[in-house]
Structure formats: structure tokens, C-alpha cells
Amino acid sequence: MGYTNVSILLGLLMVFVTPMVFADDVTPIPEGKPQVAQWFNANVGPLAQRKGLDPALVAAEAAPRIINVNPKGGEFKTLTDAIKSVPAGNTKRVIIKMAPGEYKEKVTIDRNKPFITLMGQPNAMPVITYDGTAAKYGTVDSASLIILSDYFMAVNIVVKNTAPAPDGKTKGAQALSMRISGNFAAFYNCKFYGFQDTICDDTGNHFFKDCYVEGTFDFIFGSGTSMYLGTQLHVVGDGIRVIAAHAGKSAEEKSGYSFVHCKVTGTGGGIYLGRAWMSHPKVVYAYTEMTSVVNPTGWQENKTPAHDKTVFYGEYKCSGPGSHKAKRVPFTQDIDDKEANRFLSLGYIQGSKWLLPPPAL
């Protein structure tokens, strides 16, 4: 057999042995941090190695459009103008590469513009910043970045709301950093800064990996179904401070927040992991490091006693001085392996259908 034929045969063999796999919606995130990257790579592979993704997503990823934004001059000088260039009813991935710098804009991505990616550089992350408040825009519309569309992704982006911290006296002082109301959204290595109501994790399936979220009160709130993996939750300010205010309203709702391999840090002490904003919140912390800033009771007492029987607050194999359970409120769920696995696998956010890694550009 000649060299040419051998080369062709080897090439064909490489094509046929390239793994094509379904992302596993069942395998839980491992307890050991060193194994998390392996789990992610095995279950959130690139498009070429995947089966079972939504057909619309597969079609959208076939020929991505890349556009550049630079405040100092480029294809677009503002992020708003770049987003305006995406047609309504968009059907293909649009990757907006953001140059380093500060973008003083109030940005909204409408529902009819799916498949948008905002991408910055990891060592010089662009900053989207605005100072909107509830008094001027209403709470959920005060965000510096509002995403209403599906299949959104953000990579290496900082989002801030620079409005002053609420003083307890000024009406309408809530000021969101971001509101995510679209379905199937992923955030990789992003940072969100605010005080009260930093992130409105509103509705839909969402995935946050290696992110940083800073705030004071209810700084992750809404009715989303979201997994936060390897994310730092940093609490600032003083007074009553609460991380999560999930807005579950009934036992039938499948939404909730899952914090996995996260780290709770902050200033002062007495921080609550969550509170019952509505009757049926669902919040789980797994493999999470809790520093001494966490209140020994863990969760805020319910103002409505009946909610003691309807909240679902789970803790699973967490660590650190803030994780001690001796003084936890009685409605804390010390969940077992079977129960925990629901919140530790991609099935919780339907990840096998839509979750992709950051683009390799």
C-alpha cells in the first residue's frame, strides 16, 4: 500500500474515532475540586463533539459572526450600537468582542435577538457600568445589563451598577447590575458588582462558572433555575445582609438556585445564606466554603411561620467555620446523596440541550 493510501486511511480512521457524545445530565459534579475541570470537559464539550443539542442552537453555531467593539474606535464604538446591528429574529451566533475599557451604557438585549455572546479578554476585562436605580426605572429595569433573549453567553465581562448603596431611608434605591430573563444563558469568568439586588436571576435556565458576585441584600434574587459553579459570593456593607432571595411561589415550581464549589466571603458577620422572599424558595449550597462571616443560624427566620414548612434550604458537604450546623434554623435541610445529586448534575438546568463552553477565538 502506498504512502498516499495509508494517509487517507489514517485520516478516515481519525474521523470515525472522534468521540461524539451526549452530555450527561445525570453525572453529578464531583466533590473534589481537582476533578471539576475533568467533569466539565467531559460533559460540556465543544459543538463538534456533541449530540443532543437543540437543533436551533446547532444551526446558529455553524457560521458565527464576529464583530468588534472599541470605545476608542473600531467597527463599533458602543456596545449598544453593536447590538443594534444584530437583526431582529437573529438565527446565528454573534460574538461581540469587547476591547478593554469602560462602557458607560445601559444595555438591553431584546427577546428577538438570541444567540449573542459578549466576550472580553481575561486579563483586561471590559466593564459595563451605569447608575440606574429603581426610583428612575423600576427595580428590574434599573440594571446596567438586561438580557431578555435566549442562548446568551458572556465571557470575561465585568458589570457594575455605580448608584450609591441604599441607606435605608431613600425610596427606590435598589440598583441592579444585571437582569437575566432569557432562557439558556451561560456566564464564564464574569464579575458583577452592586449592593441591594445585584443580580436579578429572573427566569430561565442559567449557568455561572468561575464568577464573582458582590452585594449586600438579596443580591441574587428571582425565579431562575440556575447553577453557580466555582463562584465567589462576596458580601459587603453592614446591617442585615442576605445572599439569595429565590422567588418560588409553589411546590410545583422547578426553579431554584444551586451553589456548588462556591465560596462565601465578606466583611463583618451575620450574613444569611438566603431568605423566604416568597413562600417556596429553593436554594442549595453544596461543597461550598463558608467563612466565619456566615450567621450561625444560616438562614433568616421566616416572617411568615407557615413558610417554615414550604422553604427548601439545603446544605451538602460544605466546609469552613460558617458551615457548622449546630445553630442552624430548624427548617434547614441536611440533604443526602440522592437528593443532592438533583442539584449537582446538568439535568438541573437542562444543560445537555444547550450548554456549550466559551468560544475558542
Curated annotation (Swiss-Prot):
Its main location: endoplasmic reticulum. The pectin methylesterase activity is inhibited by PMEI2. This is Pectinesterase PPME1. One of its GO terms (biological process) is defense response to Gram-negative bacterium. Keywords: Aspartyl esterase, Cell wall, Cell wall biogenesis/degradation, Endoplasmic reticulum, Golgi apparatus, Hydrolase, Secreted, Signal. Gene3D superfamilies: Single-stranded right-handed beta-helix, Pectin lyase-like. Belongs to the pectinesterase family. It catalyses: [(1->4)-alpha-D-galacturonosyl methyl ester](n) + n H2O = [(1->4)-alpha-D-galacturonosyl](n) + n methanol + n H(+). It comes from Arabidopsis thaliana (Mouse-ear cress). The active site is at 197 (proton donor), 218 (nucleophile). Pathway: Glycan metabolism; pectin degradation; 2-dehydro-3-deoxy-D-gluconate from pectin: step 1/5. It holds the Pfam family Pectinesterase. Interacts with PMEI2, and in vitro with PMEI1. Expressed in mature pollen grains in the anthers and on the stigma. Found in pollen tubes within the style. Located at the tip and in the shank of the pollen tube. GO terms for molecular function: pectinesterase activity.
